[in-house]
């Protein structure tokens, strides 16, 4: 069958299916309760409470989505636009928006490498959800496998594929422009998760059934190109994450992007730049009416020639500040341009930039538009203003940290969960000042209600001797005073005892010393033997242990220096 015929038949089948869906939709409308259509209240008997484990509140409109493209729900349009994505994409090239996106993308990219491979400790890590649990060798192997999977965005390494840094940069742009992040998860024939690829969020929509209601189970998402559904996905096959969710019943699960919220300000910024640009591109003349009063000698032909010369020579950049020459009785110019000086122009632009930056949670100074305070950036020198470093850190805490948390939740929900429920993805490191602030908080806690050993226990360290105390000078001083009072009390008791001894003349009975335990060896010298010498029949006279030892301390049965004769004592006399 020729390709053109196959394509034509495919279009015809699609049209038939759309027609059938529309007929089912109309039939459903006819079957809607007349109480709803006529806006009549329900009777109390027909109202059921959510006591059976089911939600009774409506999460979708009672009348389903009526769209020219049945099968999916589009985003609510603004300014009568049929496709909100196209409107957002049109203003997605705004210079302020791209400055914000590029700044945040570059900041996020600093966290897209494993922290254990970074010298600064900045990056991401895969760890156990249970902080107190010790990872086994199997857990460590799985953690390394997940890190490798994230780095390559697949089980295998392919230089033509996006790495995790590129994936996160695409994610930041998608969420800042459309507040919708989509990527497809690919599985092999055995159901194993092998890779994930980013998908254009402007082509992904929520699927609807024949009644125009959102599908809760099964193929909940569709991809639409040229107003035709080209692919369908279930919850496991496609990730659908939003950063600014809404409970609006007309919106469904679509997010609320900052670009849509500040669309009026973005349009005003574009118009302001165009207005200022035309001042240079269309010459330096202002808008107004040139009134030429011709004399009797002037003809209409000469006036037409002057008009053509004006338009040709004074228009464009090369015609700026040119002086026209005309011969007439009188020439007047009526200025129709409102007076707007450079200061007003600057304040208006500063206001737009500050409002847009505030909506994205970023300090204008991060995109090289320093703000001296106030909506127009004209105030400064306030005592409440911090230095530039503190303002930068506050800006990142307000905008960058929530963005990193959104990426963490997305990766954990749609990627890491495929490897088990016991693992968790999180970013680590960051600005050193933030870490110093955490240490200061711990230090203050250690001075009020936490002991040193409690802090060490939270950090996974062993307790130390003397660490069961808070690091508070007042508390330590109180402990020292208590010890000092104990010492004084002991000194007083000793003084009282000494005075009693003096008054009694030394007759106060002293506590008898402890008698040593009976010796089990007869050769041991007892305390009494040492003190009294045991004069008499005892073999241990003078405390000797062995009778074979002489008074000089030498053995009697052995030759020694005292038993050997010296000098002439050993020579026999003849």
Curated annotation (Swiss-Prot):
A Pfam match is Phage_portal
List all Basic and acidic residues biased stretches.
543-559
Q: Where found in the cell? A: Virion
Task: Quote the cellular component terms of the Gene Ontology held in the record.
Answer: viral capsid
Q: InterPro entries annotated for this entry? A: Phage/GTA_portal (IPR006944)
A GO BP entry: symbiont genome ejection through host cell envelope, contractile tail mechanism
Return the annotated region ranges for Disordered: 504-574
Q: Does the keyword Membrane apply?
A: no
Q: Does the keyword Glycosyltransferase apply?
A: no
Q: Which UniProt keywords are listed?
A: Capsid protein, DNA-binding, Viral capsid assembly, Viral contractile tail ejection system, Viral genome ejection through host cell envelope, Viral genome packaging, Viral penetration into host cytoplasm, Viral release from host cell, Virion, Virus entry into host cell
Q: Which coarse location class applies to the principal site listed for this UniProt protein?
A: virion
Question: What quaternary structure, including any partners, is listed in this protein's UniProt entry?
Answer: Homododecamer.
Family under the similarity heading: Belongs to the phage portal family.
Q: What is this protein called?
A: Probable portal protein
Native species = Enterococcus phage phiEF24C
Show the taxonomic lineage. Viruses, Duplodnaviria, Heunggongvirae, Uroviricota, Caudoviricetes
């Amino acid at each position: 069958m020729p390709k053109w015929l196959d394509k034509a038949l495919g279009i015809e089948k699609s049209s038939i299916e759309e027609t059938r869906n529309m007929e089912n939709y109309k039939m459903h409308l006819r079957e809607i309760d007349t109480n709803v259509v006529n806006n009549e209240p329900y009777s109390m008997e027909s109202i059921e409470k959510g006591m059976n484990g089911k939600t009774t509140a409506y999460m979708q409109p009672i009348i389903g989505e009526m769209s020219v493209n049945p099968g999916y729900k589009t985003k609510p349009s603004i300014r009568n636009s049929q496709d909100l994505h196209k409107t957002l994409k049109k203003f997605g090239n705004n210079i302020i928006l791209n400055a914000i996106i590029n700044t945040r993308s570059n900041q996020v990219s600093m966290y897209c490498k494993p922290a254990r491979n970074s010298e600064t400790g900045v990056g991401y890590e895969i760890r156990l959800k249970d902080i107190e649990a010790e990872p086994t060798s199997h857990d460590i192997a799985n953690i390394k496998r997940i890190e490798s999977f994230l780095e390559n965005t697949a089980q295998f390494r392919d230089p033509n594929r996006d790495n995790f840094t590129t994936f996160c940069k695409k994610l930041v742009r998608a969420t800042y422009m459309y507040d919708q992040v989509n990527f497809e998860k690919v599985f092999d024939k055995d159901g194993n998760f092998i890779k994930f690829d980013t998908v254009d969020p402007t082509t992904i929509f929520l699927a609807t059934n024949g009644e125009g209601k959102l599908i809760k189970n099964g193929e909940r998402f569709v991809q639409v190109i040229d107003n035709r559904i080209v692919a369908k996905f279930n919850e496991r096959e496609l990730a659908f994450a939003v950063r600014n969710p809404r409970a609006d019943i007309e919106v469904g699960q679509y997010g609320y992007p900052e670009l849509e919220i500040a669309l009026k300000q973005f349009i005003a910024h574009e118009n302001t730049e165009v207005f200022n640009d035309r001042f240079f591109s269309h010459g330096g003349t202002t808008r107004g009416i040139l009134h030429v009063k011709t004399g009797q000698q002037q003809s209409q032909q000469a006036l037409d020639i002057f008009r053509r010369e004006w338009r040709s020579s004074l228009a464009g950049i090369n015609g700026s500040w040119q002086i026209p020459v005309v011969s007439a009785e009188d020439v007047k110019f009526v200025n129709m341009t409102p007076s707007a000086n450079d200061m007003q122009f600057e304040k208006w632009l500063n206001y737009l930039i500050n409002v847009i930056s505030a909506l994205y949670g970023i300090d204008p100074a991060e995109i090289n538009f320093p703000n001296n305070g106030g909506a127009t950036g004209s105030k400064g020198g306030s005592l409440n203003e911090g230095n530039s470093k503190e303002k930068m850190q506050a800006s990142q805490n307000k905008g960058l940290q929530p963005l990193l948390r959104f990426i963490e939740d997305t990766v954990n929900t749609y990627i890491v969960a495929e490897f088990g429920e016991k693992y968790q993805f999180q970013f680590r490191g960051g600005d050193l000042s933030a870490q110093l602030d955490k240490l200061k908080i711990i230090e203050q806690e250690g001075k009020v209600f936490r002991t040193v050993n409690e802090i060490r226990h939270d950090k996974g360290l062993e307790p130390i001797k003397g660490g069961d105390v808070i690091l508070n000078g007042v508390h330590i001083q109180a402990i020292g005073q208590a010890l000092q009072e104990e010492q004084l009390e002991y000194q007083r008791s000793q003084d009282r005892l000494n005075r009693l001894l003096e008054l009694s003349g030394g007759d106060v009975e002293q506590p008898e010393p402890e008698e040593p335990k009976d010796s089990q060896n007869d050769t041991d010298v007892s305390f009494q033997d040492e003190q009294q010498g045991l004069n008499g029949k005892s073999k241990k006279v003078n405390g000797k242990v062995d009778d074979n030892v002489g008074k000089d301390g030498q053995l009697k049965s052995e030759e020694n220096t005292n038993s050997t004769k010296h000098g002439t004592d050993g020579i026999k006399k003849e």
